[in-house]
Amino acid sequence: MGSNKSKPKDASQRRRSLEPSENVHGAGGAFPASQTPSKPASADGHRGPSAAFVPPAAEPKLFGGFNSSDTVTSPQRAGPLAGGVTTFVALYDYESRTETDLSFKKGERLQIVNNTEGDWWLAHSLSTGQTGYIPSNYVAPSDSIQAEEWYFGKITRRESERLLLNAENPRGTFLVRESETTKGAYCLSVSDFDNAKGLNVKHYKIRKLDSGGFYITSRTQFNSLQQLVAYYSKHADGLCHRLTTVCPTSKPQTQGLAKDAWEIPRESLRLEVKLGQGCFGEVWMGTWNGTTRVAIKTLKPGTMSPEAFLQEAQVMKKLRHEKLVQLYAVVSEEPIYIVTEYMNKGSLLDFLKGETGKYLRLPQLVDMSAQIASGMAYVERMNYVHRDLRAANILVGENLVCKVADFGLARLIEDNEYTARQGAKFPIKWTAPEAALYGRFTIKSDVWSFGILLTELTTKGRVPYPGMVNREVLDQVERGYRMPCPPECPESLHDLMCQCWRKEPEERPTFEYLQAFLEDYFTSTEPQYQPGENL
């Protein structure tokens, strides 16, 4: 298995006669195994075998981050617990970052000293006898299902497929997650391979008996999920393949750098490698407190009011979703520093234009767009507005993970050339006409920008409206001009772009719709897709 933390134990099975209630779905691979060259990624921080996807990108150019809320790439464990549970088990290794943190190893048992609220808990290690703060998303109650390595909790069907459809995963790689459709039920997701479909995923509903047991098919029942996993690890018994390996996943990011590390002193940061430069500042890879790799965005003095920034940052740090860059900490006096998690593949724009871009085909590009739509659907639910959605503000990590960065910052910029929405500093080619002309920025103007971003993806980073200057773009768009379908791009995807570019903002689709459309694109819209020279 990916690790030996929780190998399933042998179990006795209870067999009773009930009506058959088997629910099996096959999910075709959105990433056909033959399409993407694979290269082992760094195993650092992974719970299972190292993932693989595409050739290394060019030098990283920007910064990124991680968070967990609605859907998660790393398993989503339970939050604060009722019932007085105070003994927990570590799911991952953790190295202390401050003098008040507690280092621990995966599998270590920890006694919670204070109540289980917030992102950092005071804990006492039963192994070392030491006490300190721990990240709450790195532990789970002892002897609970959350402590099992194969339990991924509340992740979506699509996210489970994204994890399992890795060319390096052997047949039978699996995870257990909560069912999206049936409350109280679970789902066993298993990777499979056949010559017709290539790499694909099968999903089996795990139903619950009134007596508390579990079954996939009623002829074979179990007292616990642990027994079910142990049994199917030895016998396929109707599954596509016996369970072989726990699905590998990255160690999650902590919520914040440490307990009470929000407004931090400038001296605690070391700027090491300059990654990029823009109109309003620079982006660096650096270290916080001598212990933690971070990305640091430095803003030129005068870019925005420190007071307004701090107020907005309080809102931004509450936006928590795995497809949004989490804001870690700030230096709130000028020059303002914005600290986030470092993401090693840089900006999506550089990624598309770099060496990796030539290997990407439509399935990967559509999946990346679905991830961006997922992050923006969360922004939509939270009644927030991005204002500057484009490939340069999307960040890429291992396995083509995409996250939305720089949300909300554009509103605070005080540069006259920018606030007048004219000139080289303002991203006119990405901006909806009502926002560019009248300053009406809404989630619907973000939808327009998303349509432009889709052209960046399908052209591997080409500047929108090629050959046209900003003023010309504004005039032509007002007269009804819309970009034509990019070469090799299916008409169905261009039609989605045109929906995003409807003149009336309220007629544009929601991000919730865009996410669902793109996640199901190759089953519902383009099931006959065949790879071309570029897409």
UniProtKB/Swiss-Prot annotation:
Cellular-component GO terms for this entry: actin filament; caveola; cell junction; cell-cell junction; cytoplasm; cytoskeleton; cytosol; focal adhesion
Domain Protein kinase: 269-522
Listed SUPFAM superfamilies: Protein kinase-like (PK-like) (SSF56112), SH2 domain (SSF55550), SH3-domain (SSF50044)
CDD domains xrefs: PTKc_Src (cd05071), SH2_Src_Src (cd10365), SH3_Src (cd12008)
Xref: InterPro entries: Kinase-like_dom_sf, Non-receptor_tyrosine_kinases, Prot_kinase_dom, Protein_kinase_ATP_BS, Ser-Thr/Tyr_kinase_cat_dom, SH2, SH2_dom_sf, SH3-like_dom_sf
Compositionally biased spans, kind Basic and acidic residues: 7-19
Compartments reported by the entry: Cell membrane; Mitochondrion inner membrane; Nucleus; Cytoplasm, Cytoskeleton
Phosphotyrosine modifications at: 186, 418, 529
PTM text: Myristoylated at Gly-2, and this is essential for targeting to membranes.
Assigned EC number: 2.7.10.2
Phosphoserine found at: 17, 21, 74
A GO biological process held by the record: stress fiber assembly
Top-level taxon in the UniProt lineage: Eukaryota
TM region(s), chain numbering: none
Region listing for Disordered, in residue ranges: 1-56
Domain SH2 per the UniProt entry, residue ranges: 150-247
Top EC class of this enzyme: transferase
Function: Non-receptor protein tyrosine kinase which is activated following engagement of many different classes of cellular receptors including immune response receptors, integrins and other adhesion receptors, receptor protein tyrosine kinases, G protein-coupled receptors as well as cytokine receptors. Participates in signaling pathways that control a diverse spectrum of biological activities including gene transcription, immune response, cell adhesion, cell cycle progression, apoptosis, migration, and transformation.
Protein family: Belongs to the protein kinase superfamily. Tyr protein kinase family. SRC subfamily.
Subunit composition and interactions: Part of a complex comprised of PTPRA, BCAR1, BCAR3 (via SH2 domain) and SRC; the formation of the complex is dependent on integrin mediated-tyrosine phosphorylation of PTPRA. Interacts with CDCP1, TGFB1I1 and TOM1L2. Interacts with DDEF1/ASAP1 via its SH3 domain. Interacts with CCPG1. Interacts with the cytoplasmic domain of MUC1, phosphorylates it and increases binding of MUC1 with beta-catenin. Interacts with RALGPS1 via its SH3 domain. Interacts with CAV2 (tyrosine phosphorylated form).
Protein name per its UniProtKB record: Proto-oncogene tyrosine-protein kinase Src
